[in-house]
Amino acid sequence: MSKKRKRQDDFQKTKLKVGKKKPKADNATNVNFRSKSIHLPEQLKHGESGPTTHRHLDIKDLLSQLHHFNSNVKQGALVGLRELLSANPTMVELHASVVLSEVAALFTDKDGSVRAAAVRLLRFVAQCIPSERVAPFFPLLSAHLTCAMTHISEAIQEEALRVLDVLLEHYPGLLSQRHTVLLGNFLELISQRRKSGTGQDKSGKGSYALTVTTNRSVTAQQWRLTVLLRLSNFLQAVVEERPLEEGVSSRIGLGMWAVEKGLVTPVDVTWEEHVNGQGKIQLFENSGAGPTSHSAYRLRPDSKSGAGMDKELCSAETVQGFAATLVPLLLEIWVEAAGGGRVQTDSGHLLSAESMALMFQILSILQLLRRMTPQRDQQDVLDAWFRNSYLTDFKQHFMKNFPYGLLEVARHKKKADGKRIKQPVAAGVVAGSTVEPLAVNVTLCQVMVTLSLRGQDHVAAEDADWLGPIRVFIRETLSNGSKLSSKHLAALLEVVWRMIVTQRSRVVTDELLQAVYVQYQQRNLSVNVRSLLLRFFSQLYIQEHQNHPHIARSRILARWLASLPVQLVQLGSRNPQLSAQLLETVQPAAARGNKDLLQSLQKNACSLYDPQEGCVVVLPVESQKRLVQILHFLPEFPAELLACLSEVCNTGRVSASLATTLIRTVHLRSPLSGCSSASQDVPLKDVDYLSFFFTTLTGFSSDMLRALQDKDEDDLLAASTLSPLSVYTTSLDQFLHHWDVVEVVCHCLDTLGSRAQCFDVIQNAIINNLAGLVVVPDCVCVALLRCVPRLLDVNFLPSDTLLHFLSDCCLSMLSLLLQLEQSARKRDAVWEACFAALSSVPRLLRLVLQSFRVLDLCEDELPVLAQILSLLLQHTQLRNHMMANASFLQHIIQDLTHYYGGESREQWLIDLLYCYSVTLSTHRANMGIRDIY
């Protein structure tokens, strides 16, 4: 075989037969094995460096995984961070900076599950950290939120609104400070800037045009509703978090009600703190004429303005600039939505649930735009601008079919399918769709009445075509007997207030107030609703009474004022807050001399000041003070009312200071005080005046004193030779309360013109009503011993009957004084009264000494007599009076010494003899000195 043929054999292929396997090559690799992946769910760590998750991952590992390329790893890291921080709350604030920065960076992540987990973690962190701790990191959060809201991806824009919800819920104040940027972002979510040079700006549609995106999971109208709902919430936060300045209407409750209020800044002063004159009081703070100074210092430069916003919304001009961009978009949105609704129904006033929610958000935004201005005068400028710019559009698009109702659409049952996935995306739409027609109609009324200018008759005539339906709607809504919620009622009352003030018509005023009064007269209203109606009528009368005569002459308002005392009697202590609100109106109305109120107040005075169940004793202290102050304006004080007031002062159910104020008020209303007015009507008769003061002086009425005479002896200090009267001991609180009352009674009686006549009246009253009593309360005895010396005239001699009764009272109180060991204040008061009477009333001390008959005393009473005499002798100012009756004193001591004539004497007798010898020697020394000179 040739060499050439051999070479061909080397490259010749082996032909395989069908069904035979190819033989393996000599260098073939055996692949008969299986491989498995190694999965490490947790770190293999032996030493614990800090808190970890159940997978043994610490916070550094979790934060590092947030930068992983795999979405599942990032989502697991976010879940792990929430687990770690919830198990260790102290780590939240410790790692707040890095956690917030990393979470904020994931707002724009391309994976939806990662963004959702980031929002859940942000919500958890926001619940744990207060706003002051987040403030340093909030610019970063706001920047990432802006990136998400302006992102090209529709899904990221939708997730950005959920981030906005979290920040609005937990940090509204911080978020509202970034409104210059975020408001422009809202515009870009639903619109885009028109191209310049196309001529579209001249058509009045604004510089922005609505956009329609087909890539979203919801319709364009649903997306706009979602954005407008967040925009409304954001504007609400901006308005509420803005610091309240002078002249701005109150944002709590009914913002319109405080519009006409003066700009005087009140200064609260507690006079008790300035009794000694050590502190200075600034009575006026510019009287409201100058604005409060605010510091212009900033920790960081202001943020750059966003799209559509060049300056902060702090003036009418800046708000107008933003409104000029936003309002045309809102009108265009509503025209588009309303056009689609008319295709389905011929009734333009019936709206679908989605259109109803859309209109409500549009109207809410319009209302909030007006409240963006910080001062009252700028609000008027903004209202005028809205009227000139958009009144025609509002009447055409909003008022044409007013009022609106809900269109009921039959819903067919659909099979459950994968559409549930769209539920989270349209969550904002669902939240904004639950709007009642009443809320939409009321909000529309609020927006429209702000466009009516006040004080211009020709303007009012021009506005009658759209103000008339509003007035009819309000009247029917308030008068149909349905119970309204506090939110809807507050909005309706705001509209009523505005229409009453602007139209200045007595017919319109009575018509609207009659509707409100019908709502007010309903029974079983909630406390919030009742309080709201009370505040409306009260502020309408107090603030607008003098500025608007048509309000002052309203018959409905007069009828409401006349019903207040009756309501106060019926309400009582069942609701102290509502009673306090009633009194806040009754007092200024009484001060202004409202005849209807004063007549009703006079008619129900005895019920209001009833000592058992009246408002003056069952309400809190502040309300009690108002009731006492109202007495100053009461037309008359009949005897029945004075009896109630006297018992109120004596029962102790009001404080001593308040009882003092009440007594002084009655005193000033009497002609005897010399301070009453020169009018012919006498509010208080002299007889009733003196009867009131005598009853208050005694502390017990005649019926109560009569009942004490039949009281069991176990509750009394029995009468004896040294205590001629049976004493009824009162409690310490009652005694001290009555002591303070006695002081002011004595002061008032002491200021009367003729003291002799006053004392004669009091003397006859004591003799006729008290002298024949056997059982006398201790406070009554002390009151008489305190009052008689102060009222006794030098040239007037008291009667023997009065002196003997005072002697019995003094003896009984001296005996009681020795038994008062625990109460020092009561003992001091008793001794002060006894000393004043013994040292000032002529012959009283002699009668007391004459009643000390040693031979008639038992052995147990002798020490008591000795202690009384020692007490009288030890007092320096009584020594001269005692020595003036030295013969009686010497006779008593001789009888005591004769009774104990033995060598052994009791200690009480030794003390008495010592006091007597000291007093006698001192008196003789003084007499010797006078003889020398």
Curated annotation (Swiss-Prot):
Belongs to the IPI1/TEX10 family. It is found in: Nucleus, Nucleoplasm; Nucleus, Nucleolus. Component of some MLL1/MLL complex. Component of the PELP1 complex, composed of at least pelp1, tex10 and wdr18. The complex interacts with pre-60S ribosome particles. Component of the PELP1 complex involved in the nucleolar steps of 28S rRNA maturation and the subsequent nucleoplasmic transit of the pre-60S ribosomal subunit. Disulfide bonds: none annotated. One of its GO terms (cellular component) is nucleus. Residues 14-23 have a biased composition (Basic residues). HEAT repeats lie at residues 99-137. It comes from the Eukaryota. This is Testis-expressed protein 10 homolog. It comes from Danio rerio. Transmembrane segments: none annotated. Keywords: Nucleus.
